[in-house]
Amino acid sequence: MAKLDVFDIKKAKVGEIELDDAVFNDDVREYLIHEAVKIQLANRRQGTVAVKNRALVAGSGKKPFKQKGTGQARQGCRRAPQYPGGGVAFGPQPKDYNLSMNKKARKAALRSALSMLYKKDAITVVNSLELPSIKTKAFVEVLTAFNLDKTLVITDTATPTLELSARNVKHVKVLGPEGLNIFDIMKYQSVVFTEAAVRRVEGALQS
């Protein structure tokens, strides 16, 4: 069974934690990770971009001049794309970019991503992330103690002290276990869990 040391916020070892191999030491299926990230990013798209075509732009539908006898190319109306102020030809219209992935595959992708981080030794477990007060400096000192830079923090309980202390720190994101997602796991170079958060994630990702 996979194991990790448990530290306090000053990086003093306070124990060990056994990890569920099915969650943190599973086979890494990169194709599933890629698919899950692609779907999450696609589902973020608003798809509301739109331009006016010749049917929507304001203006008369009257023929600008007669069909024959002027020596000019025939024209249908002033709303045509070749005219200034005319409609756009083949421009973007609202579109639904949403894709779906079944729950079993989503969980498998998250397990693969966490297993990849575990095998890279990029997971840190702490007994608690309670800070005495809201101070960005105190949170930065915790990151410095663990030599962490681009970090995703998963904490078991909503702690305004931690969230407010971390808010102004670049390349750091604080989430609860229910907010754990494939894009953020892959975006950040390391993940810090509290002990309780590890257990909640294991419970949520059981196959």
UniProtKB/Swiss-Prot annotation:
Which InterPro entries does the entry link to? Answer: Ribosomal_uL4, Ribosomal_uL4-like, Ribosomal_uL4_dom_sf
Region described as Disordered: 62-85
Q: Example GO biological process term? A: translation
Is Ribonucleoprotein among this UniProt entry's keywords? Answer: yes
Gene3D superfamilies hit by this protein: 3.40.1370.10
UniProt keyword terms in alphabetical order: Ribonucleoprotein, Ribosomal protein, RNA-binding, rRNA-binding
Please name the Pfam families in this protein's record: Ribosomal_L4 (PF00573)
Q: Does the keyword Ribonucleoprotein apply?
A: yes
User: What is the similarity comment for this entry?
Assistant: Belongs to the universal ribosomal protein uL4 family.
Classification via PANTHER family:
50S RIBOSOMAL PROTEIN L4, LARGE RIBOSOMAL SUBUNIT PROTEIN UL4M
- What job does this protein perform? One of the primary rRNA binding proteins, this protein initially binds near the 5'-end of the 23S rRNA. It is important during the early stages of 50S assembly. It makes multiple contacts with different domains of the 23S rRNA in the assembled 50S subunit and ribosome. Forms part of the polypeptide exit tunnel.
Name of this protein: Large ribosomal subunit protein uL4
Organism in which the protein naturally occurs: Citrifermentans bemidjiense (strain ATCC BAA-1014 / DSM 16622 / JCM 12645 / Bem) (Geobacter bemidjiensis)
